[in-house]
Protein backbone atom coordinates (compact mmCIF):
# COMPACT_ATOMS: atom_id res chain seq x y z
CA UNK A 1 0.00 0.00 0.00
CA UNK A 2 1.35 3.43 -0.97
CA UNK A 3 0.88 5.91 1.85
CA UNK A 4 0.06 9.52 0.97
CA UNK A 5 1.51 12.01 3.45
CA UNK A 6 2.00 15.74 3.70
CA UNK A 7 5.01 17.07 5.61
CA UNK A 8 4.36 19.62 8.34
CA UNK A 9 6.71 22.23 9.74
CA UNK A 10 5.03 21.86 13.16
CA UNK A 11 5.21 18.73 15.32
CA UNK A 12 1.53 18.36 16.16
CA UNK A 13 2.36 15.91 18.95
CA UNK A 14 3.97 18.79 20.86
CA UNK A 15 2.07 21.88 19.79
CA UNK A 16 -1.39 22.42 18.30
CA UNK A 17 -2.03 24.76 15.43
CA UNK A 18 -5.32 25.88 16.99
CA UNK A 19 -6.51 26.20 20.58
CA UNK A 20 -10.25 26.75 20.71
CA UNK A 21 -11.49 28.37 23.91
CA UNK A 22 -15.24 28.39 24.44
CA UNK A 23 -15.20 31.56 26.55
CA UNK A 24 -18.94 31.29 27.28
CA UNK A 25 -21.97 29.16 26.42
CA UNK A 26 -24.17 32.28 26.34
CA UNK A 27 -25.69 33.16 22.96
CA UNK A 28 -28.80 35.02 21.84
CA UNK A 29 -29.35 32.63 18.92
CA UNK A 30 -30.79 29.11 18.95
CA UNK A 31 -29.21 27.49 15.90
CA UNK A 32 -30.56 24.10 14.87
CA UNK A 33 -27.11 22.50 14.64
CA UNK A 34 -25.37 24.15 17.62
CA UNK A 35 -22.55 21.99 18.99
CA UNK A 36 -22.73 23.75 22.36
CA UNK A 37 -26.52 23.73 22.81
CA UNK A 38 -25.95 27.38 23.72
CA UNK A 39 -28.27 29.21 26.12
CA UNK A 40 -29.19 32.91 26.53
CA UNK A 41 -27.24 33.18 29.79
CA UNK A 42 -23.80 32.08 30.89
CA UNK A 43 -23.64 28.72 32.65
CA UNK A 44 -22.23 28.31 36.17
CA UNK A 45 -18.58 27.38 36.38
CA UNK A 46 -17.24 29.56 33.58
CA UNK A 47 -13.55 30.30 33.88
CA UNK A 48 -13.13 33.54 35.81
CA UNK A 49 -11.17 36.49 34.47
CA UNK A 50 -8.12 35.42 36.46
CA UNK A 51 -8.47 31.83 35.28
CA UNK A 52 -8.79 33.11 31.72
CA UNK A 53 -5.52 35.00 32.07
CA UNK A 54 -3.94 31.85 33.47
CA UNK A 55 -5.19 29.90 30.44
CA UNK A 56 -3.57 32.47 28.14
CA UNK A 57 -0.31 31.87 30.02
CA UNK A 58 -0.81 28.14 29.44
CA UNK A 59 -1.25 28.70 25.70
CA UNK A 60 2.02 30.65 25.72
CA UNK A 61 3.50 27.65 27.53
CA UNK A 62 3.49 25.68 24.28
CA UNK A 63 6.33 27.93 23.15
CA UNK A 64 6.88 29.60 19.81
CA UNK A 65 5.43 29.52 17.28
CA UNK A 66 2.39 29.98 19.49
CA UNK A 67 -0.87 28.29 18.53
CA UNK A 68 -3.67 30.48 17.25
CA UNK A 69 -6.12 31.13 20.10
CA UNK A 70 -9.67 31.02 18.75
CA UNK A 71 -12.18 32.67 21.09
CA UNK A 72 -15.54 31.06 20.47
CA UNK A 73 -18.77 30.28 22.27
CA UNK A 74 -21.74 30.64 22.50
CA UNK A 75 -21.13 34.20 21.50
CA UNK A 76 -17.74 35.42 22.63
CA UNK A 77 -18.97 39.03 22.66
CA UNK A 78 -21.33 38.19 25.53
CA UNK A 79 -18.37 37.70 27.83
CA UNK A 80 -17.90 41.12 29.53
CA UNK A 81 -14.10 40.90 29.74
CA UNK A 82 -13.57 39.57 26.23
CA UNK A 83 -11.40 42.42 24.97
CA UNK A 84 -9.31 42.42 28.14
CA UNK A 85 -8.58 38.77 27.39
CA UNK A 86 -7.80 39.57 23.75
CA UNK A 87 -5.42 42.33 24.83
CA UNK A 88 -3.69 39.99 27.28
CA UNK A 89 -3.17 37.35 24.60
CA UNK A 90 -1.95 39.70 21.89
CA UNK A 91 0.41 41.36 24.40
CA UNK A 92 2.03 37.93 24.79
CA UNK A 93 2.37 37.64 21.02
CA UNK A 94 -0.34 34.97 20.75
CA UNK A 95 -2.34 35.32 17.51
CA UNK A 96 -6.05 35.67 18.30
CA UNK A 97 -9.12 34.93 16.21
CA UNK A 98 -12.71 35.55 17.25
CA UNK A 99 -15.96 33.81 16.36
CA UNK A 100 -18.85 36.10 17.37
CA UNK A 101 -22.51 35.66 16.57
CA UNK A 102 -24.32 38.19 14.42
CA UNK A 103 -26.44 39.86 17.09
CA UNK A 104 -26.82 43.43 18.34
CA UNK A 105 -23.55 42.83 20.22
CA UNK A 106 -21.61 42.95 16.93
CA UNK A 107 -21.54 46.74 16.69
CA UNK A 108 -19.20 49.05 14.82
CA UNK A 109 -17.57 49.76 18.19
CA UNK A 110 -16.97 46.04 18.74
CA UNK A 111 -15.43 45.73 15.28
CA UNK A 112 -13.22 48.72 16.05
CA UNK A 113 -12.08 47.05 19.27
CA UNK A 114 -11.17 43.93 17.31
CA UNK A 115 -9.00 46.00 15.00
CA UNK A 116 -7.40 47.98 17.82
CA UNK A 117 -6.71 44.84 19.86
CA UNK A 118 -4.88 43.17 16.99
CA UNK A 119 -7.36 40.37 16.28
CA UNK A 120 -6.00 38.44 13.28
CA UNK A 121 -9.24 36.98 11.94
CA UNK A 122 -12.98 36.91 12.59
CA UNK A 123 -15.39 34.17 11.58
CA UNK A 124 -19.13 34.50 11.05
CA UNK A 125 -21.66 31.85 10.10
CA UNK A 126 -23.63 31.83 6.86
CA UNK A 127 -25.78 28.74 6.44
CA UNK A 128 -27.77 29.66 3.37
CA UNK A 129 -27.78 31.90 0.33
CA UNK A 130 -31.35 32.98 1.02
CA UNK A 131 -33.08 34.43 4.04
CA UNK A 132 -35.47 31.49 4.21
CA UNK A 133 -32.69 28.91 4.45
CA UNK A 134 -30.26 30.81 6.67
CA UNK A 135 -32.91 32.12 9.05
CA UNK A 136 -34.42 28.65 9.30
CA UNK A 137 -31.09 27.29 10.52
CA UNK A 138 -30.30 30.22 12.81
CA UNK A 139 -33.74 30.39 14.38
CA UNK A 140 -34.05 34.18 14.04
CA UNK A 141 -36.21 35.82 11.32
CA UNK A 142 -34.25 38.57 9.57
CA UNK A 143 -30.85 37.17 10.58
CA UNK A 144 -29.66 36.74 6.98
CA UNK A 145 -30.26 40.43 6.31
CA UNK A 146 -28.14 41.25 9.36
CA UNK A 147 -25.35 38.83 8.45
CA UNK A 148 -24.49 40.13 4.97
CA UNK A 149 -23.91 43.73 6.16
CA UNK A 150 -21.88 42.37 9.09
CA UNK A 151 -19.62 40.48 6.68
CA UNK A 152 -19.10 43.63 4.63
CA UNK A 153 -18.38 45.70 7.75
CA UNK A 154 -15.66 43.30 8.90
CA UNK A 155 -14.09 43.18 5.44
CA UNK A 156 -14.21 46.98 5.18
CA UNK A 157 -12.48 47.23 8.58
CA UNK A 158 -9.53 45.34 7.13
CA UNK A 159 -10.01 42.18 9.16
CA UNK A 160 -9.39 38.75 7.70
CA UNK A 161 -12.87 37.27 7.44
CA UNK A 162 -13.79 33.60 7.51
CA UNK A 163 -17.29 32.35 6.76
CA UNK A 164 -18.43 29.13 8.40
CA UNK A 165 -21.12 27.08 6.65
CA UNK A 166 -22.56 23.87 8.05
CA UNK A 167 -23.66 21.52 5.28
CA UNK A 168 -26.98 19.74 5.76
CA UNK A 169 -29.86 18.51 3.66
CA UNK A 170 -31.68 21.82 3.93
CA UNK A 171 -28.87 23.94 2.43
CA UNK A 172 -26.60 21.71 0.35
CA UNK A 173 -28.31 22.86 -2.86
CA UNK A 174 -27.32 26.50 -2.10
CA UNK A 175 -23.55 25.99 -1.77
CA UNK A 176 -22.72 27.51 -5.17
CA UNK A 177 -24.82 30.56 -4.32
CA UNK A 178 -23.03 30.89 -0.98
CA UNK A 179 -19.71 30.78 -2.84
CA UNK A 180 -20.95 33.66 -4.98
CA UNK A 181 -21.73 35.71 -1.86
CA UNK A 182 -18.24 35.05 -0.52
CA UNK A 183 -16.59 36.11 -3.77
CA UNK A 184 -18.71 39.25 -3.97
CA UNK A 185 -18.02 40.35 -0.39
CA UNK A 186 -14.26 39.74 -0.44
CA UNK A 187 -14.18 36.99 2.18
CA UNK A 188 -10.77 35.36 2.76
CA UNK A 189 -11.70 31.87 3.95
CA UNK A 190 -14.65 29.52 3.55
CA UNK A 191 -14.69 26.93 6.33
CA UNK A 192 -17.27 24.26 5.60
CA UNK A 193 -18.52 22.18 8.53
CA UNK A 194 -19.90 18.68 8.06
CA UNK A 195 -22.37 17.55 10.69
CA UNK A 196 -21.45 15.43 13.66
CA UNK A 197 -24.36 14.46 15.89
CA UNK A 198 -23.55 16.37 19.08
CA UNK A 199 -25.52 19.12 20.81
CA UNK A 200 -28.50 20.30 18.78
CA UNK A 201 -26.82 18.85 15.69
CA UNK A 202 -28.28 15.49 16.70
CA UNK A 203 -31.65 16.62 15.34
CA UNK A 204 -30.34 18.01 12.04
CA UNK A 205 -30.37 16.21 8.67
CA UNK A 206 -26.90 15.11 7.61
CA UNK A 207 -26.09 14.37 3.98
CA UNK A 208 -25.10 10.87 2.81
CA UNK A 209 -21.55 9.56 2.39
CA UNK A 210 -21.83 9.83 -1.40
CA UNK A 211 -23.11 13.40 -1.07
CA UNK A 212 -20.14 14.19 1.20
CA UNK A 213 -17.86 13.00 -1.60
CA UNK A 214 -19.60 15.10 -4.24
CA UNK A 215 -19.60 18.20 -2.03
CA UNK A 216 -15.86 17.81 -1.43
CA UNK A 217 -15.23 17.70 -5.18
CA UNK A 218 -17.36 20.83 -5.53
CA UNK A 219 -15.35 22.54 -2.77
CA UNK A 220 -12.14 21.73 -4.64
CA UNK A 221 -13.62 23.53 -7.64
CA UNK A 222 -14.77 26.45 -5.48
CA UNK A 223 -11.22 26.89 -4.15
CA UNK A 224 -10.23 28.36 -7.55
CA UNK A 225 -12.24 31.56 -7.02
CA UNK A 226 -10.09 33.66 -4.72
CA UNK A 227 -10.81 32.38 -1.20
CA UNK A 228 -9.23 29.60 0.85
CA UNK A 229 -11.44 26.55 1.37
CA UNK A 230 -11.15 24.42 4.51
CA UNK A 231 -13.35 21.78 6.06
CA UNK A 232 -14.25 20.80 9.62
CA UNK A 233 -15.00 17.14 10.38
CA UNK A 234 -14.43 16.23 6.73
CA UNK A 235 -10.69 15.54 6.56
CA UNK A 236 -11.35 13.38 3.49
CA UNK A 237 -11.58 16.70 1.62
CA UNK A 238 -7.77 16.65 1.74
CA UNK A 239 -7.81 13.23 0.09
CA UNK A 240 -10.12 14.56 -2.64
CA UNK A 241 -7.81 17.53 -3.24
CA UNK A 242 -4.78 15.23 -3.48
CA UNK A 243 -6.60 12.95 -5.91
CA UNK A 244 -7.76 15.83 -8.10
CA UNK A 245 -4.22 17.22 -8.21
CA UNK A 246 -3.09 13.77 -9.33
CA UNK A 247 -5.56 13.89 -12.21
CA UNK A 248 -8.58 12.06 -10.78
CA UNK A 249 -11.66 13.19 -12.72
CA UNK A 250 -14.57 14.80 -10.93
CA UNK A 251 -17.55 12.55 -10.19
CA UNK A 252 -20.63 12.48 -12.38
CA UNK A 253 -23.16 12.56 -9.55
CA UNK A 254 -26.23 14.77 -9.88
CA UNK A 255 -25.44 16.86 -6.80
CA UNK A 256 -21.89 17.61 -7.97
CA UNK A 257 -23.04 18.40 -11.51
CA UNK A 258 -25.70 20.78 -10.23
CA UNK A 259 -23.33 22.58 -7.85
CA UNK A 260 -20.57 22.75 -10.47
CA UNK A 261 -22.98 24.18 -13.05
CA UNK A 262 -24.13 26.77 -10.53
CA UNK A 263 -20.54 27.77 -9.82
CA UNK A 264 -19.79 28.27 -13.51
CA UNK A 265 -23.00 30.24 -14.07
CA UNK A 266 -22.45 32.52 -11.08
CA UNK A 267 -18.66 32.98 -11.12
CA UNK A 268 -17.51 31.91 -14.57
CA UNK A 269 -14.55 29.71 -15.40
CA UNK A 270 -11.98 29.10 -12.62
CA UNK A 271 -9.51 31.96 -12.66
CA UNK A 272 -6.95 31.09 -9.99
CA UNK A 273 -4.98 28.13 -8.70
CA UNK A 274 -6.67 26.04 -6.04
CA UNK A 275 -6.39 27.46 -2.54
CA UNK A 276 -7.73 24.35 -0.82
CA UNK A 277 -6.26 23.99 2.67
CA UNK A 278 -4.68 20.57 3.23
CA UNK A 279 -2.81 20.74 6.55
CA UNK A 280 -3.13 17.28 8.10
CA UNK A 281 -4.70 18.32 11.39
CA UNK A 282 -7.60 16.47 12.97
CA UNK A 283 -9.35 16.18 16.32
CA UNK A 284 -6.60 16.02 18.94
CA UNK A 285 -3.80 16.36 16.39
CA UNK A 286 -3.07 20.03 15.82
CA UNK A 287 -6.37 20.94 17.48
CA UNK A 288 -7.46 21.10 21.11
CA UNK A 289 -10.63 22.51 22.68
CA UNK A 290 -11.11 24.15 26.08
CA UNK A 291 -14.73 24.34 27.23
CA UNK A 292 -16.31 27.22 29.15
CA UNK A 293 -15.57 25.49 32.47
CA UNK A 294 -11.95 24.65 31.68
CA UNK A 295 -12.51 21.03 30.68
CA UNK A 296 -10.29 19.98 27.78
CA UNK A 297 -11.40 17.89 24.78
CA UNK A 298 -9.66 16.76 21.57
CA UNK A 299 -12.05 19.01 19.62
CA UNK A 300 -15.38 20.73 20.06
CA UNK A 301 -17.22 17.87 18.38
CA UNK A 302 -15.42 15.05 20.23
CA UNK A 303 -16.75 14.90 23.82
CA UNK A 304 -13.95 12.83 25.36
CA UNK A 305 -12.84 14.65 28.54
CA UNK A 306 -9.07 14.87 28.94
CA UNK A 307 -8.72 16.91 32.12
CA UNK A 308 -9.08 20.51 33.25
CA UNK A 309 -6.87 23.55 32.82
CA UNK A 310 -7.82 24.40 36.40
CA UNK A 311 -5.65 21.53 37.61
CA UNK A 312 -3.29 20.55 34.78
CA UNK A 313 -1.39 22.76 32.31
CA UNK A 314 -2.88 22.61 28.84
CA UNK A 315 0.45 21.67 27.26
CA UNK A 316 0.78 18.67 29.58
CA UNK A 317 -2.72 17.47 28.69
CA UNK A 318 -2.13 17.94 24.97
CA UNK A 319 1.27 16.25 24.92
CA UNK A 320 0.76 13.44 27.41
CA UNK A 321 -2.86 12.27 27.47
CA UNK A 322 -3.14 8.63 26.32
CA UNK A 323 -6.34 9.29 24.33
CA UNK A 324 -4.51 11.85 22.23
CA UNK A 325 -1.58 9.48 21.79
CA UNK A 326 -4.04 6.89 20.46
CA UNK A 327 -5.60 9.35 18.03
CA UNK A 328 -2.20 10.43 16.72
CA UNK A 329 -0.97 6.83 16.46
CA UNK A 330 -3.29 6.21 13.47
CA UNK A 331 -4.14 2.73 14.76
CA UNK A 332 -7.57 3.10 13.21
CA UNK A 333 -10.00 0.27 12.58
CA UNK A 334 -12.24 -0.37 9.59
CA UNK A 335 -11.53 1.40 6.31
CA UNK A 336 -9.53 4.17 7.96
CA UNK A 337 -7.03 1.60 9.24
CA UNK A 338 -6.42 0.30 5.73
CA UNK A 339 -6.43 3.62 3.89
CA UNK A 340 -3.35 4.94 2.09
CA UNK A 341 -4.54 8.47 2.94
CA UNK A 342 -4.64 7.84 6.72
CA UNK A 343 -1.89 10.35 7.51
CA UNK A 344 -3.18 13.08 5.20
CA UNK A 345 -6.80 12.51 6.22
CA UNK A 346 -7.32 10.18 9.17
CA UNK A 347 -11.08 10.51 9.11
CA UNK A 348 -13.27 12.43 11.53
CA UNK A 349 -12.51 11.00 14.95
CA UNK A 350 -15.54 12.89 16.28
CA UNK A 351 -17.90 11.24 13.79
CA UNK A 352 -16.38 7.82 14.45
CA UNK A 353 -16.97 8.30 18.17
CA UNK A 354 -20.51 9.60 17.69
CA UNK A 355 -21.39 6.60 15.51
CA UNK A 356 -19.66 3.81 17.43
CA UNK A 357 -18.34 5.07 20.77
CA UNK A 358 -14.81 4.37 19.51
CA UNK A 359 -12.69 7.36 18.40
CA UNK A 360 -10.46 5.02 16.37
CA UNK A 361 -13.28 3.54 14.27
CA UNK A 362 -13.80 4.36 10.59
CA UNK A 363 -15.45 7.61 9.51
CA UNK A 364 -18.96 6.66 8.41
CA UNK A 365 -19.28 9.72 6.15
CA UNK A 366 -16.39 8.72 3.87
CA UNK A 367 -17.38 7.01 0.62
CA UNK A 368 -13.82 6.13 -0.42
CA UNK A 369 -12.85 2.47 -0.69
CA UNK A 370 -9.13 2.13 0.10
CA UNK A 371 -6.93 -0.09 -2.01
CA UNK A 372 -6.53 -2.47 0.93
CA UNK A 373 -10.26 -3.19 1.33
Specify the residue positions occupied by each region the protein language model found.
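Short loop/turn motifs at secondary-structure junctions
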Residues: 30, 64-65, 118, 186-189, ...
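A generic "binding-loop/recognition-motif" signal
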Residues: 27, 102, 130, 302-305, ...
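Conserved alpha-helical substructure of the radical SAM core
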Residues: 1-121
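Radical SAM enzyme [4Fe-4S]-AdoMet core and its adjacent flexible, acidic
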Residues: 115-117, 125-127, 132-281, 292
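Residues embedded in well-ordered beta-strands within globular domains across many folds
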Residues: 70, 123, 191, 230-233, ...
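Accessory C-terminal segments flanking Radical SAM cores
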Residues: 235-372
Amino acid sequence: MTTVTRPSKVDFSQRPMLVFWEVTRACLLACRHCRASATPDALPGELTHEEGLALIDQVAGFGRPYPILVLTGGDCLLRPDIFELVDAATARGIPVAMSPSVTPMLTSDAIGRMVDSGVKAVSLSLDGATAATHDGVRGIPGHFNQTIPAIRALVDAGLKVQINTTVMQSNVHELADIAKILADTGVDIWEVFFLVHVGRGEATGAITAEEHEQVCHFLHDASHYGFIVRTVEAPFFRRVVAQRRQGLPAPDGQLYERLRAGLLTLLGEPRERSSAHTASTRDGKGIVFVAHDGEVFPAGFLPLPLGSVRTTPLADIYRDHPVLHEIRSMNFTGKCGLCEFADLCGGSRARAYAATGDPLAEDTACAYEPAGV
